[in-house]
Structures are given as structure tokens and as C-alpha cells.
């Protein structure tokens, strides 16, 4: 079999006659059952799902990575996502620091390789099916392909669109792109693109990319109407409505830059209507507290709840996908033994956000409070959660009392807040306390706020062959409720929007009220609640770039592991946008002089040294 690189290179577009032979490219991780499919076209459709479980490209230096892992890699460039453990194992550190060079760092090259690899897959199938003469099965498959292509281009154009910085301290040191990149998206490659065209394929305008996205969505809606998916990996009409809502929210947020899509009021009304249709058509309901915190199925099982509208999955037989360093369960697992690139890195919630989140909100239990690490086996009822205090009653750090052997901790004492809630752990309290230590690189111990949101499959934290085979949500119904509230703000006003925001957040905190009286106040509450809701699911990256939320991890008392992570930028953060990798620049001369530029963030770090930053661990936060 041939090896291909990316959609921009001439070698990507295989001839029509060779499509069947190339249905299972050697660069993809494939499930043996899917590979043995009796129908070649159906096998190609099935390979969409397995490709999203694990894509690789050895020639391009792309390790096996899943769709979910790509999205969380991007999210490392947002305020809520903090890493508190050993930086040497942080394979996503470039995104965390905002150091994605213009020619594509080792991590910056992933989006273009990955998404164009996905696009090539669906293009091959679309090119095989004649919409004027197709069976019901072919019609369904064509609809699935158009839905996925819309998803891929929608995410890729958001990632690659260059946005000019708005923060004065960033503008002052900006390395200007070689040419004006305003409203430039990505090269468009479809089933009709020839090899010659692919080798000289300029960046289409963002508007042109959205033309294709909306066209694909219209076809997907037409072809999938009446189709009932047998599995959540197949998009339903409800998922198409959800994609419409996402797309129109982005169009509405960029009317000042767009050349064609200028009707902001109509787009917001579309967001409201499509989000509402998605909620109704899906029949889905928000996750309950028990489902969210389920130590066996929490955020790893597409069938254990009624919230997910669209999903990816990794089967246990897909050994490359479950053993990769970019397996989602490995990356996000605090309790798992699978990889030091996960539990020793310590994906955590930003401290300021954690402290702002109400104790009455059960989502807060997704991150471990510092007091969790001070609960010894000698804990007395009613006494503070401290191993040792000094004469003044303060925590005593002098004897390194937290670096205890596993046996010194109690498995059964595990309490959060005055209600003495027990965290729902997949492993045990002693297991976590024995590993999440200063000795293992957690220099800010115990001020980590480390996550237990994402559970290994079946709750199996010590066997990657089982625990790493997890599902991942492409779309949850909760997102539609949030988008509906955002759209209501721009179409009906603050009161209507506040009511809708209250409706969804009250399912997490029954005492929540939205007291906003202005659009600005509403959006502040909206963004906070949505960031908490979708932490670790990739949604926060796309929202941050769409709404230009900046990155605000630089402050006194931050829980960042090192000062390079403690960025404080308003508006557009340049670290959201990677450059095109060198192979693509060489293969496609039309984009060579239109690459995204790179500005080193060291010129606007909040802190200038680790000593300066770490001296403030655990100190009271200063609230503006």
C-alpha cells in the first residue's frame, strides 16, 4: 500500500480506480473486525470511526493520536486547563506555553496532519457514491461522510485561522506575518480536487470554507433524515442540528472579519433555533451527578447515560490506539497506571476558577481539594484536615510531612467540604496520595486541584488493555442548552438568557441564580459555567478563540507548575494558532508565503522565574 502525507500534497489524492485498494491505509490504526468487513465501501465508512480512535503518520512524525486527545491538546492553551505535575512528561507543553512555531512545532503540526487525514478518508467515500443513483445504505453512508467532513473543516478552519492580537503588550512584540492573513482559512480539498490542484492550493477565505461546511450540513441533513443510528458513533439528524448551532455561533461571532457572512442577527436566531431542535430531536438529557461521578463509567461510556449526542470509541482490540502516549485515558487519567505522560503531568483546574466555583455545585468534586492530601489515617472527627500544624496553627511544611509511604494514608477517609462528601474514586485515596507527591514532581503540592473527571473504561485503572479503551463525546446535549442561552442573549435580552442559563446550571447547583443585568455580566457568568462544564472536552479551546477570551493563568497564587505556563493575555492569544508544517509548505507553494507567524511569549510572561511564582503557592487570592 502507498503511504500518503496530507491533503495538500499531490500524493494524497489517489485515483478513483484505486480507492477500493486504499480503503485501509497503512498509516491508520484499524480494528481487525472492521478491516474484515465484507463490503469495501462500508469498510471505508467504518474506518472513519477507527481513524478517529487512532491516527498516525510516521513520515510526518505524527504518533498515534485520537480525536479526543487532539482536542484536549488544543485545550492546553486555555485558562481552565493547568498542568501541576512534572513538566518533563508534558507532551502537550508547547500548547500549554503558547510556543507553537510558525513552521509547526512537533505538536503544532498535529492539527493539519490529523484533520486532512480525516478529510481524505471521507473524500474517498464521497467520490465513490453517486447521489443521483444510490441505495438507502449508500444514502446513509453519504450523509455520514458529509456530516463528518463538516465537523472536520469546521474545527480545522477555527484552529488555523490567524487572529491578530488585541492585547497591547502582545501587539508591541508581534512578529508580523509575511502577508495579510485576515479572513484566510485553509486550503479546500474535496473529492473533486486533483493532484495538480492540491499542489498549488491557496488558503481559501474563511467564508469559502463555511460555504463548504454549510453545504455539507445541508446534504447530511437531507440524507440522514429518517435514519436512526444504531450507535452514537454515527451522526444523527439531531447531531447535524447541533453542528448547525455551533457553526452559526461562530459565524455570528466573526461578522466584523467576514467578507460574506455579515447577518449577525439572523445567525444568532439560527443558533437558538438549531440548538432547540437538537435538544428536542436528540431526546437527550443532561448528565446527573451520579452519572458524572460514576467511577466505572464516568466520561468513558457512550451508552451509560443519555447526555451524549455523538461520540467516538476505541475498542479493546485496537491495540495501537490503546497503547499510545496520546491515548485520552492515559493523558487525562490521574488514577491510571498506564503512562507517566498522564498521571505525572497532573491535568488540573485553574485555582482561581476552582475557588470561584460554589461548593454547592457537584461538578466541583471533579477536582481534588488541597485538604484531600492532608487527611492521614490518624484523622480525628471534627478536626482540621491537617497532618501537622506549627505553634501558630499554620500548616507546617518544614518536615516534608506529605511525602509519606502509601501505607500511612487511609483508604476510607476521604472528605470534601463541610458536608463531608466522599469523592467517588476509581482507585483509592491512599493510591492517589501515594503518587501525587512532591517527589513525583508536584512542586505546588497540595495546591493542584487535580482532576478525577475522566475515568478509565470499566473503572480498570491498572490495565491499559481494558482501561484505555474509552469512548469520548463529540457532542453533549448540555452544549446545546448553553448555546441556546447565548443566542437568547443576542435575540431576546439578558432576562431570557439568564433564565436559560439558570435552567442548565441548576441541574448542577440547585441554588444557582444568574443575577446579570448587562450583556457583559451575563457573558462573564456564561463563560465561567461553560468552561467548568466542558473542562477537558475540547469545547473550551474553540470558545476561547471564538469569543477571544484570552488566557489568564498568570496571577499571584496560581497553581501552574512553572512560570512559562502562567500567561496573562487579554483578547486573542497567539498560542491558539499553529503554523503549517514544513512538508505542507514545500508541497503546496500557494501557502508558502501565507503562513501563520510566531511570536515568542517569553516577552510577556507574568512571572520572570519559577522562584517568584512558586513563592505564592497557597496564598490567598486577590480578587478584583
Stretches found by the model and what they are:
Residues 2-42, 213, 245, 485:
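Bacterial Sec-dependent N-terminal signal peptides
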Residues 19-72, 275, 333, 342-345, ...:
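Membrane-proximal, proline-rich intrinsically disordered regions
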Residues 20, 238, 243-291, 308-309, ...:
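Aromatic-residue-lined binding/catalytic grooves and analogous aromatic/hydrophobic interfacial grooves
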Residues 86-163, 200, 204-209, 218-230, ...:
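Conserved, well-structured interaction surfaces
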Residues 157-164, 228, 250-261, 492:
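Short coil/turn linking the two alpha-helices of tandem helical-hairpin repeats
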Amino acid at each position: 500500500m502507498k503511504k500518503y502525507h496530507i491533503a495538500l500534497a499531490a500524493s494524497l489524492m489517489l485515483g478513483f480506480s484505486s480507492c477500493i485498494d486504499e480503503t485501509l491505509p497503512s498509516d491508520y490504526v484499524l480494528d481487525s473486525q472492521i478491516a474484515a468487513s465484507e463490503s469495501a465501501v462500508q469498510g471505508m465508512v467504518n474506518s472513519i470511526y477507527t481513524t478517529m480512535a487512532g491516527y498516525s503518520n510516521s513520515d510526518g512524525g505524527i504518533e498515534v493520536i485520537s480525536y479526543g486527545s487532539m482536542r484536549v491538546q488544543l485545550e492546553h492553551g486555555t485558562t481552565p486547563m493547568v498542568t501541576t505535575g512534572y513538566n518533563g512528561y508534558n507532551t502537550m507543553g508547547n500548547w500549554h506555553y503558547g510556543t507553537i512555531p510558525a513552521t509547526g512545532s512537533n505538536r503544532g503540526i498535529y492539527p493539519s496532519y490529523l484533520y486532512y487525514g480525516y478529510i481524505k478518508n471521507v473524500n474517498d467515500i464521497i467520490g465513490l457514491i453517486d447521489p443521483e443513483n444510490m441505495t438507502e445504505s449508500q444514502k446513509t453512508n453519504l450523509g455520514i461522510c458529509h456530516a463528518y467532513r463538516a465537523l472536520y473543516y469546521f474545527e480545522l478552519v477555527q484552529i488555523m485561522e490567524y487572529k491578530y492580537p488585541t492585547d497591547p503588550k502582545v501587539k508591541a512584540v508581534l512578529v508580523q506575518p509575511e502577508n495579510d492573513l485576515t479572513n484566510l482559512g485553509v486550503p479546500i480539498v474535496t473529492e473533486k480536487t486533483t493532484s495538480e490542484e492540491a499542489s498549488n492550493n491557496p488558503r481559501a477565505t474563511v467564508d469559502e470554507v463555511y460555504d463548504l461546511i454549510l453545504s455539507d450540513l445541508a446534504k447530511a441533513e437531507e440524507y440522514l433524515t429518517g435514519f436512526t443510528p444504531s450507535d452514537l458513533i454515527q451522526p444523527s439528524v439531531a447531531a447535524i442540528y447541533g453542528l448547525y448551532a455551533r457553526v452559526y455561533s461562530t459565524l455570528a461571532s466573526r461578522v466584523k472579519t467576514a467578507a460574506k457572512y455579515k447577518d449577525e442577527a439572523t445567525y444568532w436566531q439560527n443558533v437558538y433555533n438549531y440548538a432547540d431542535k437538537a435538544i428536542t430531536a436528540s431526546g437527550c438529557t443532561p448528565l446527573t451527578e451520579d452519572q458524572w461521578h460514576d467511577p466505572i463509567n464516568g466520561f468513558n461510556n457512550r451508552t451509560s447515560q443519555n447526555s451524549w449526542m455523538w461520540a467516538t470509541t476505541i475498542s479493546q482490540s485496537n491495540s495501537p490506539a490503546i497503547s499510545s502516549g496520546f491515548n485520552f485515558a492515559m493523558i487525562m487519567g490521574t488514577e491510571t497506571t498506564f503512562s507517566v505522560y498522564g498521571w505525572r503531568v497532573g491535568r488540573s483546574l485553574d485555582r482561581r476558577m476552582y475557588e470561584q466555583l460554589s461548593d454547592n455545585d457537584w461538578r466541583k468534586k471533579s477536582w481534588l481539594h488541597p485538604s484531600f492530601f492532608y487527611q492521614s489515617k490518624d484523622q480525628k472527627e471534627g478536626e482540621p484536615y491537617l497532618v501537622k500544624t506549627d505553634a501558630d496553627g499554620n500548616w507546617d511544611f518544614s518536615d516534608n510531612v506529605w511525602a509519606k509511604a502509601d501505607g500511612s494514608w487511609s483508604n476510607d477517609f476521604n472528605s470534601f467540604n463541610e458536608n463531608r462528601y466522599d469523592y467517588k474514586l476509581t482507585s483509592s485515596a491512599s493510591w492517589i496520595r501515594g503518587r501525587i507527591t512532591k517527589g513525583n514532581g508536584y512542586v505546588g503540592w497540595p495546591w493542584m486541584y487535580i482532576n478525577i473527571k475522566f475515568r478509565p473504561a470499566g473503572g480498570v485503572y491498572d490495565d491499559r488493555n481494558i482501561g484505555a479503551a474509552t469512548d469520548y463525546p463529540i457532542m453533549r446535549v448540555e452544549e446545546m442548552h448553553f448555546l441556546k442561552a447565548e443566542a437568547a442573549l443576542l435575540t431576546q435580552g439578558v432576562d431570557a438568557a439568564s433564565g436559560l442559563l439558570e435552567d442548565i446550571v441548576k441541574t448542577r447547583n440547585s441554588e444557582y441564580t444568574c443575577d446579570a443585568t448587562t450583556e457583559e455580566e451575563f457573558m462573564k457568568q456564561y463563560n465561567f459555567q461553560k468552561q467548568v462544564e466542558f473542562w477537558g472536552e475540547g469545547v473550551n479551546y474553540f470558545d476561547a478563540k471564538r469569543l477571544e477570551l484570552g488566557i489568564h493563568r498568570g496571577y499571584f497564587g496560581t497553581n501552574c507548575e512553572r512560570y512559562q505556563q502562567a500567561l496573562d493575555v487579554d483578547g486573542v492569544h497567539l498560542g491558539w494558532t499553529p503554523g503549517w508544517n514544513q512538508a505542507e509548505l514545500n508541497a503546496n507553494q500557494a501557502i508558502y508565503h501565507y503562513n501563520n507567524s510566531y511570536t515568542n511569549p517569553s516577552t510577556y510572561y507574568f512571572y520572570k522565574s519559577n522562584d517568584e511564582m512558586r513563592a505564592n503557592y497557597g496564598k490567598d487570592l486577590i480578587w478584583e
